[in-house]
Amino acid sequence: MFKHTRKLQYNAKPDRPDPLMARRLQESLGGQWGEVTGMMSYLSQGWSSTGSEKYKDLLLDTGTEEIAHVEMISTMIARLLEGAPIYAEADAYKSDPALAAVMGGMDPEHAIVHGMTASLNNPNGAAWNAGYATSSGNLVADMRFNVVRESEARLQVSRLYYMTRDEGIRDMLKFLLARETQHQLQFMKAQEELEDKYGVVVPGDMKDIEHTKFSHVLMNFSDGDGSRAFEGQVAKDGEKFTYQEDPEAMGGVPTFKPADPHLHNDQG
């Protein structure tokens, strides 16, 4: 179960309204790598975990913390929109370039759809969707996704940090940067432990089935040959990479039977 407390995990109070920054912060909320994606991914992974309680608790702890981050960013966005102009005459735009910039850059959905509050959208109004989240049932794969998600989220927060001089916003972003450092490191550690147990390739028990002669071949499919530098190096599974300069077309020319005439696939 969840139990809500009205106190935020950390400060989320800007120095002044800024609807442009409110729009930018929507990426860290409802974007592909935003906090909603982390929340739904980690909670789903934790709920479906039937293995070690250590990993289940790690995922549920972090997923629940992501709810707090959703709350913080939503609060920050709402506060950035407090007092922002929602009506302006054409003459006002001409006489006040700053107002024109604000009104031109703010997300109209903040006012029209959400009443000057946050939304589960990215800055361009695209709604968050469950396709951003991952819960495969394989914790090696999921932990790798989690490292990527935290890396992308931290990268975006670092970019947002330099898009504002507001110390209140920066204070919250500094906290998020630190927490995403922790989350990257914890998921990396879990990934390493799981790889030691199950192998570095996901899934790790298919060697007897796959065509292993292709498993460690770098195939040159471009004009450059920079990837040749990996030739002879040892992969994480202990095998050496080989290099194929001119990959062979081994599958022949595909042919197909005509479609049903009622489909009118007139193709000559």
Which residue ranges define each predicted feature?
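Non-heme di-metal
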Residues: 1-268
